[in-house]
Amino acid sequence: MSKRDAERAKKRIEAAALKIFVHQGYHGTSMRDIAKASGYSIGNIYNHYKTKEKIYVGLIRRFETRMAEKRNEFMENLGDVFDTRELERLAWAVHDIVFSMPDYWRLMYIDVVEFRNRHFAHSFHQFAKKVEAALGERLETSTRRGSWSGVDPALAITTIYLQFFNYFLLQKVFSVKQPLGLPDQQAISQIIQMMTRGLWRDTRLEKT
C-alpha cells in the first residue's frame, strides 16, 4: 500500500472512530464498532494501528496540528496586542477555532474522564510561554504605549485568550446560550474592558 493510500485509510478509520468516541466514549467503543463504521476489517485496522488508543491519539494529533495552524495564523496577524480592537479580533478568532472543531473539545472531556487528562495535559503546560513565543517582540512592545501595571504581559494575554475560549466552549460544547446574559458582541466588549481597564474608575482623576 502506498503512503497516500495508507494516509487515506487512516483518515477514514479515524473519522469513523471519532463519531463513535464522541457518542459512546473511549471505553464504550470497541474495535469492532470502528471496523463496522469505517468499512475496514478489524485485521486491516490493526495494520495501521496497534491499539485502539493509537487511533484515539492519532485523532488528537490531527486536531492539534489544525489548532496550531489556526492559532499561529491569527497570532501572526495581531498588531498592538492589548489594543481593544485587536483583542476583539482575537475573540472572534477563538470563536472560529472553537466552533470549527467542537469534536476536539469533546475528545478532551473524554480524556479528562477516562484517562485523567493523560493525552491533553501537555497542550496547556506552560501555555503562556507558547503564546509569548508566538507573539515575540510585539508582546513587550504593546505594553509601552501607556503606564503598564507591571503584570506579566504573557500571563495577561494568555488569561484573556483562555477567557474567550471558556466563553465560546460553553456555547458550542455545552449548548449554553448567552452565558453572560448578553449578546456576544456586548459580552466580548465587557470582557475586554474588564481585562484591560479593571473594575474600578480612577477617582483620583475625577477629583482633579
Kindly give the residue locations of the regions a language model identified.
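N-terminal intrinsically disordered/low-complexity leader segments
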Residues: 1-8, 75, 203-208
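Helix-turn-helix
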Residues: 12, 16, 20-54, 58-62
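Amphipathic, non-transmembrane alpha-helical scaffold segments
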Residues: 14, 60, 64, 109, ...
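Amphipathic alpha-helical linker/stalk segments
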Residues: 59-90, 135, 140-143
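Amphipathic alpha-helical packing segments from all-alpha helical-bundle domains
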Residues: 68, 72, 96-100, 118-144, ...
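Hydrophobic alpha-helical connector segments
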Residues: 72-103, 153-160, 204-205
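Amphipathic alpha-helical segments used for helix-helix packing
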Residues: 99-119, 169-174
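Hydrophobic/aromatic-rich alpha-helical bundle segments in the mid-to-C-terminal region
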Residues: 105, 140-192, 202-208
